[in-house]
């Protein structure tokens, strides 16, 4: 059992060192993803405590947060310089795709609200 604990500590330390070498723009995107998922979790907890009377509003909020997080992950994949699949794609194009997809997502969410 002590070996598993030391392996877990080594794993966490190596992940921390690897993440410290991550560029700042990717860390900002990661923070945005964490914020979006945390907001969705807060909405789910609120729904569990208070109730979900306007259920379409609850669904719209959660789907908006999760959809935005998914789009941000796609942006992170496209902007990452180590990713060889998107070498020819400029970061400006990836960001423009992100903004356009977010616009479409939120138009659909607003339409769902009624």
UniProtKB/Swiss-Prot annotation:
Q: Which Pfam families match?
A: DAD
Topology relative to the membrane: Multi-pass membrane protein
Q: Where in the cell is it found?
A: Endoplasmic reticulum membrane
What's a single GO CC term here? oligosaccharyltransferase complex
The pathway is: Protein modification; protein glycosylation
Q: Which residues lie on this side of the membrane: Cytoplasmic?
A: 1-30, 76-93
Q: Which UniProt keywords apply?
A: Apoptosis, Endoplasmic reticulum, Membrane, Transmembrane, Transmembrane helix
Which residues are exposed on the Lumenal face of the membrane? 52-54
Please, one GO biological process term? protein N-linked glycosylation
Similarity-based family: Belongs to the DAD/OST2 family.
- Relate the protein's function as given in its record: Subunit of the oligosaccharyl transferase (OST) complex that catalyzes the initial transfer of a defined glycan (Glc(3)Man(9)GlcNAc(2) in eukaryotes) from the lipid carrier dolichol-pyrophosphate to an asparagine residue within an Asn-X-Ser/Thr consensus motif in nascent polypeptide chains, the first step in protein N-glycosylation. N-glycosylation occurs cotranslationally and the complex associates with the Sec61 complex at the channel-forming translocon complex that mediates protein translocation across the endoplasmic reticulum (ER). All subunits are required for a maximal enzyme activity.
Return the protein name. Answer: Dolichyl-diphosphooligosaccharide--protein glycosyltransferase subunit DAD1
Give the classification, highest ranks. Eukaryota, Viridiplantae, Streptophyta, Embryophyta, Tracheophyta
Q: Which gene encodes it?
A: DAD1
């Amino acid at each position: 059992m002590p070996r598993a604990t030391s392996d877990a500590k080594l794993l966490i330390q190596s992940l921390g060192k690897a993440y410290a070498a991550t560029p700042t723009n990717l860390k900002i995107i990661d923070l945005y993803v964490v914020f979006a998922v945390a907001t969705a979790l807060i909405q789910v907890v609120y729904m569990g405590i208070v109730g979900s009377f306007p259920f379409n509003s609850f669904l719209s909020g959660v789907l908006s947060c999760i959809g935005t997080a998914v789009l941000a992950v796609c942006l992170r994949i496209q902007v990452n310089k180590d990713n060889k699949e998107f070498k020819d794609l400029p970061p400006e194009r990836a960001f423009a795709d992100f903004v356009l997809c977010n616009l479409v997502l939120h138009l659909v969410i607003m339409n769902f609200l009624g």
